[in-house]
Amino acid sequence: MMMKYEAVIIGGGPVGFMLASELAIAGVGTCVIERLEKPVPHSKALTLHPRTLELLEMRGILERFVSKGSKIPTGHFSMLDTRLDFSGLDTSCPYTLLLPQSKTEKLLEDHARSLGTEVFRGAEALAVTQNGEAVQTIFKDRDGSVRTITSKFAVGADGAGSTVRKQAKIEFPGTDSTVTAALGDVVLLSPPPSGVLSLCTKEGGVMIVPLSPDRYRVVVISPYRTQTPKDVPVTEEELKADLLRICGTDFGLTDPSWMSRFGNAARQAKRYRDGRIFLAGDAAHIHFPAGGQGLNVGLQDAMNLGWKLAAAIKGSAPSWLLDSYHDERHPAAEGLLRNTEAQTKLIDFTQAGLHLRSMMSELLAFPDVNRYVAGQISALDVRYEADRTMPPNRLNGARLPDMKLILSDGNSERLYSFLQNGTFVLLSLRQEADDHIEVKGLRTVTASLAEPNEKLRNVHTILIRPDGHVAWAVDASAPDCSEVIQKGISRWFSVTSRV
């Protein structure tokens, strides 16, 4: 049976459903092919970081997630004693949201379906091939029938063992695991007083966070078990023994609902695009799960790719736009792999290692150092290469935080509210600006700032991308300001034939 969609996503985890939602709000006919008939009940990831929360806020769905999670104003770097302080960061979401991945996935799947995405669960992708004009995806449906989908693009969001990546023959260089650790979702009859614990001694490291009123995630890194193969099952007795040795108590650990062993393998796809095929999330990059960053970076991949694919499909993308996905997101994941490798090296239980950890913890107590590292973990410091065809500006390529605006009619609105439909926003901060520019996919807003903002001082106009990054900004002092703005609009809205 032959079916047609404009875009096919292989992999129905959080990244796949985030991408499907982005395509759907742009009116792109999309389907998701997911091997599992039902979502996995356990959760690998537990946290959504500030930048991811900003993206959800841009689409007007943040409260759905916040209502089911718990806000934590801090994060951690390599389980050091000094926590990362998110509360002072320049964001409307200065916290980590503790929310199990299973709930995140459910919310994103529901959102994607509500926007019209078709989901094939219990379906296995067998072959993904392309020519210059289309992609053919052959899959086995849950009833055993073999179907073929023809689409303009396909995206592999199908995890570390990605079928899409392998069939596209995209290299996945990196390193295999050299150490392993264990985790368990358990009941603790005598939990830590605050419910949260991060501890490292010469006997190993432990992290404990609450999942629900009666269940906790326990992570143990034992120097005596780091060479245990990943496929060796974790036992309740192992977790209890390690807790007792490291913490002096096993906290009354009982009733594990899920236990797993994980390693520090680190790999990254050599390229994120091969013609009409793209990779996102774990299909593009894997790493040691330090700092809870992997899911977040994957969701940010989806947010970067969605509007670009939609523009290409609708015929409004300049020729260079699709290549910019790799150019922007590959370096972002390189930074992720660097900082998680650094965190892995810091998890050292020798005497020298503990001294190094103590010194690093002291350094994190300096506000500037803490802010720098927090910017990396939160992904708020991700900045894309500036558009070199436009005059240099300190804002070009940076994310733009949410802010209160006073509109020309005197009413106030939050900046992110204008991004809910996934369009570009041309924000003019001068009342004399031309607010009659009409370009499909561009919303023009003339406003003033409700509060002084040094970063925006003397700025005339900003073109804000659908993912909240600044495409370009023009200062009021720029020569031929109006001409430069028109040039910038033409640069990003070059009309092409539909692909």
From Swiss-Prot:
Keyword Flavoprotein: yes
GO biological process, one term: catabolic process
Signal peptide: none
Annotated binding of FAD, by residue: 6-35, 272-282
Protein name: Uncharacterized aromatic compound monooxygenase YhjG
Database matches in InterPro entries: FAD-bd, FAD/NAD-bd_sf, RIFMO-like
Organism in which the protein naturally occurs: Bacillus subtilis (strain 168)
Phylogenetic placement of the source organism: Bacteria, Bacillati, Bacillota, Bacilli, Bacillales
Keyword Magnesium: no
Required cofactor names: FAD
Transmembrane segments: none
